[in-house]
Amino acid sequence: GKGVKVWDKDGNEYIDMFAGIAVNALGHAHPKLVNALQGQVEKLIHVSNIYYNEPAIEYAKKLLPLTEFDRLFYANSGAEANEGAIKLALKYTGKSEIITAKDSFHGRTLLTLAATGHEEYREPYLKNLPQGFIEVPYNDIEAIKEAISDETAAIMLEPIQGEGGVNVPSKKYFDEIAEICAE
């Protein structure tokens, strides 16, 4: 691939509308990304998060001022990031439920499958999935309000559902959810 284009084994050209399921925002083989990756591989390919490394520290210094937070956790996948968020919500609230949306996708690990709103992904593992995920229709504030209980630890939603059919919420959806969470 190059940029937004990819080619199959027969040379047919396609526009990659998936962009690596939204992780290839720069396209394929972007020169700045290729150079940065090559430079990093020449120094250090991977270390556990047990060790500090200069690129991670420099990125955190740039990223954190853009947020209301004073620390971050690097994850290697969406599933790992989502598992971390779920565990933090459960641990620090002491509560047992997380509200999620129908047709959502949060990963393929057991915990993130439990949060995923696609029965076909969960079905083979139903008897082994963790409990506590309350599913509501996407873009439905009233359903979220009705689902909230004394055990609600978090509301876990995608800004735009991909697996659910590229569902874009109303402009006020996340503002209203933020207000609900602040209450």
Residue ranges, per PLM feature:
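Active-site and channel-lining beta-strand-loop segments
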Residues: 1-16
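Glycine-rich loop-to-alpha-helix module at the N-terminal edge of alpha/beta enzyme cores
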Residues: 13-99
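Beta-strand scaffold of nucleotide-dependent catalytic cores
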Residues: 15-18, 146, 178
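Short, small-residue-enriched loops and turns at beta-alpha junctions
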Residues: 23-25, 143, 162-166
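A short acidic, helix-capping loop that chelates divalent metal ions and anchors anionic groups
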Residues: 45, 108-109, 163-165
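PLP-dependent aspartate aminotransferase-fold enzymes
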Residues: 62-154
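Catalytic PLP-binding core of fold-type I/II PLP enzymes
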Residues: 149, 167-183
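Short acidic, glycine-rich surface-loop motifs adjacent to enzyme active sites
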Residues: 151-166
